[in-house]
Amino acid sequence: MKTSVLPGVLLLSAASAGLQAADVNDVQNHYRDSGAGPFSFDRGEMLWNSQFYEGRQCATCHGTDLTRNGRHERTQKPIEPMAASVNTTRYKDLKEVEKWFMRNCKWTWGRECTPQEKGDLLEYLKRL
């Protein structure tokens, strides 16, 4: 009797796809669960363009055209575009999004971002 491995492969593939199914709205829902929202494009844009800790702003490294690559000011490492329209996978992994918010908020703002600020920034970035 021959057994097919195809059903098992299909099941594993479907399960793996479920892990990657999140999008920017799912990430924002995580912040809503923390009591944040509603999120605002205008507040996100204002936060993006404001100067914070030691005169830094998001555009210092990410640039002003968020459909293009940026460059980290200190390390000179390239940064992929932030606009969701050209970088469709950037905001699909909550753990990855949180890691970068933690690093970048502390470096740019001198503190962690609030869930409201994160949601507003994502609202801005997802519409570009």
Show where each model-derived region lies.
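Electrostatic cytochrome c docking/interface patches
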Residues: 22-52
